[in-house]
Curated annotation (Swiss-Prot):
It is a multi-pass membrane protein. Belongs to the UbiA prenyltransferase family. DGGGP synthase subfamily. It comes from the Archaea. Disulfide bonds: none annotated. It catalyses: sn-3-O-(geranylgeranyl)glycerol 1-phosphate + (2E,6E,10E)-geranylgeranyl diphosphate = 2,3-bis-O-(geranylgeranyl)-sn-glycerol 1-phosphate + diphosphate. One of its GO terms (molecular function) is magnesium ion binding. GO terms for biological process: glycerophospholipid biosynthetic process. It is an enzyme of class 2 (transferase). It comes from Methanothermobacter thermautotrophicus (strain ATCC 29096 / DSM 1053 / JCM 10044 / NBRC 100330 / Delta H). InterPro entries: DGGGP_synth (IPR023547), Prenyltransferase_related (IPR050475), UbiA_prenyltransferase (IPR000537), UbiA_sf (IPR044878). Keywords: Cell membrane, Lipid biosynthesis, Lipid metabolism, Magnesium, Membrane, Phospholipid biosynthesis, Phospholipid metabolism, Transferase, Transmembrane, Transmembrane helix. Pfam families: UbiA. This is Digeranylgeranylglyceryl phosphate synthase. GO terms for cellular component: plasma membrane.
Length: 281
């Protein structure tokens, strides 16, 4: 893959774009603003990934030596300029959508830079920041499409799921993080406590997620797919409680990603647009 595309982590960026598309399904709006908001989210997320790799070049040499900067396919200086250009483009497009969307993009961009520079290595603070930004993608879509209430609730669940995965990823990367002098949760409080906290976030998300149906945000079509996601999260929670070694953490991290994907599919299935198309409720 071209290193300038790879460093964006396009799969993660597309996952962020899906939040906007899900809000479009909920509102039933599919116009230029949806397309532009999707491009904004992809660009800003990609920029955040680039600046993250810029500041993480030393630790990635241990944990992720195949990434573009530690592998030498992109210089650190070029990556820094690349991220600035991407952040600027995302901000300009955000202001084209409106003052509030533009301010959200600018503030998110600044937070992503500060996260990569200072917050990432701090116990839980970095995890909370990236989880907040993930949930904010839903809220951004809700602001653009005029459905803020639902977007906040969906963003909350995205926050819970992301918190679980971020903690598990820290467990997976504990060796390199310790060598870099980071103070992530597994380093400061141990792997066992980290596993318990990650499992707790998965359990909270699993047990409360049916409320989105009860509140009338989604139709009954939401429930069957949601149950699959809950099964994945519960299995992942049990696994991380039973073992906290790197291999288990790596597997659980992948399972959480699958669970998040299934949750997003459940959001889509229960949306007003899909319900109207199927004639089911």
């Amino acid at each position: 893959m071209n290193p300038y595309i790879e460093i964006l982590r396009p799969v993660n960026a597309v996952m962020a774009v899906i939040t906007v598309m899900l809000m479009a399904l909920i509102t039933g709006r599919f116009d230029f603003s949806v397309l532009l908001a999707s491009v904004v989210v992809f660009t800003a997320t990609g920029a955040g990934n680039v600046i993250n790799d810029y500041f993480d070049h030393e630790i990635d040499a241990i944990n992720r030596p195949e990434r573009p900067i530690p592998s030498g396919r992109i210089s650190r200086g070029v990556a820094g300029v690349y991220s600035i250009i991407l952040f600027a483009l995302a901000s300009l497009m955000g202001f084209y959508l409106g003052l509030l969307p533009g301010l959200v993009v600018v503030s998110s961009s600044l937070l992503m830079v500060y996260y990569a520079w200072r917050l990432k290595k701090r116990c839980l603070v970095g995890n909370i920041t990236i989880s907040f930004l993930t949930g904010l993608s839903f809220v951004f879509g809700g602001i653009v499409l005029g459905e803020v209430r639902a977007s906040i609730l969906l963003g909350f669940y995205a926050f819970l799921m992301t918190m679980a995965r971020e903690i598990v990823k820290d467990m997976e990367d504990v060796e390199g993080d310790r060598a870099e002098g980071a103070t992530t949760l597994p380093i400061t409080h141990g792997m066992r406590i980290s596993g318990v906290l990650a499992a707790s976030f998965m359990l909270i998300a699993s047990l409360t997620s049916p409320s989105l149906y009860l509140l009338g945000i989604f139709s009954a079509l939401y429930i069957p797919v949601l149950l699959l996601a809950v099964a994945v999260f519960l299995r992942a929670a049990i696994m991380i409680l039973r073992g906290q070694d790197r291999a288990t953490a790596s597997r659980v991290s992948r399972m959480i990603k699958v669970g998040m994907a299934l949750t997003f599919i459940a959001f889509a299935a229960g949306s007003g647009t899909i319900t109207a198309l199927t004639g089911l409720s």
